[in-house]
Amino acid sequence: MSGLRVLITNNTLAGRAGTELYVRDTALELLKRGHSPIAYSTILGEVARELVKANVPVVDDLYNLAVVPDLIHGQQHMELMTALLHFPQVPAIQFVHNSRSWYEKPVHFPRILRYVAVDHVCRDLLLEHAVPETRIRVVLNFVDLARFRSRRKPLAAAPQRALLFSNYASEETHLPAVREACARASIQLDVVGSQTNTATMQPEEILGEYDLVFAKARSALEAMAVGAAVVLCDYEGSGPMVTPSNFARLRPLNFGRRALSEPLDARVILEEIRRYNPTEAFRVSQTVRATAGHESVVDELSSLYEEVIREFQQNGHCEKLEEDRAAAAYLRQLKIDFTANTAAATRLRERFERVPLVGRIGVALARSFMRGK
């Protein structure tokens, strides 16, 4: 099918976080292929402006959308359900990017015909919520290879410069442990991220300057694509140096939480730094560039879009009573989840506020918890 009109939802299109950038990169590639992506979120900002500049329509109220999409690519369940109820004859796919976020919990609704997990951890979440395995697809995360080009110079024989690449990096999270490990190894460390007021709109322009990058998930994948050696690390814990021997195990985990099984201890991180090997980093980068490019992933998504549209056309429309009851069940669960998460975030914020050195970052993490980031 050509010229599909795809409505992509997300809880925000403001900061440059994982799902926001997934929307941006997917929409831009769809546009390049002759499709008509439209982005919807009630919170607009930097990423929304990037999309508009690239001629992708962005709306924060579906009543302002004068056309009916062929398919809903739904990220975060409240925005997905808003779109499903606004467009009663349109099928949908729910995408799950985060196994711990209440915003990402799977929704049971008659017109959600497929569920996409970006890693095996999210696939497990879908299975735990009674989503039939036949409706689940695992489509691993990707990197825009046209933006994140291979570095021009080979890595140094021993790491000279390192980057901590994380929006959660601060004095109250994993920055001290990483800094101490780098100091022991005589490596200069820079930090890029929102908590240190050093975030950048063009990470692809700086990643190639570093021999070693500490990151997780999408950020780690981008650093690998450029050619840096990568140690998995974030505020939740530390993980291994990514090597040719462990890449196949870590890739289905999205280089994320489940891979961060070690404590945030300078000694642990230093052990991983000592595994630095320019030849192995180059091999990892070649593997990423051969298997994790955005074009092949959007090929897969396009095929899935077409599959869902055909299935919906063949099977006919859903009964209104069935949809109404599914919507009622969703609202009931939404109230339960919202109440539980509001209480948990309040307790977390109050606990952090009582610790002087942790207060600011703790409140930020509590807010992030509520937003599902």
Where are these regions (language model features)?
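A charged, aromatic-enriched C-terminal amphipathic alpha-helix characteristic of glycosyltransferases
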Residues: G18, K153-L155, L260-A326
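Catalytic binding pocket for nucleotide-activated donors in carbohydrate/polymer assembly enzymes
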Residues: R218-R283, T287
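A short, glycine/small-residue-rich beta-strand->loop->alpha-helix junction that serves as a flexible
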Residues: N10-Y22, S170-T173
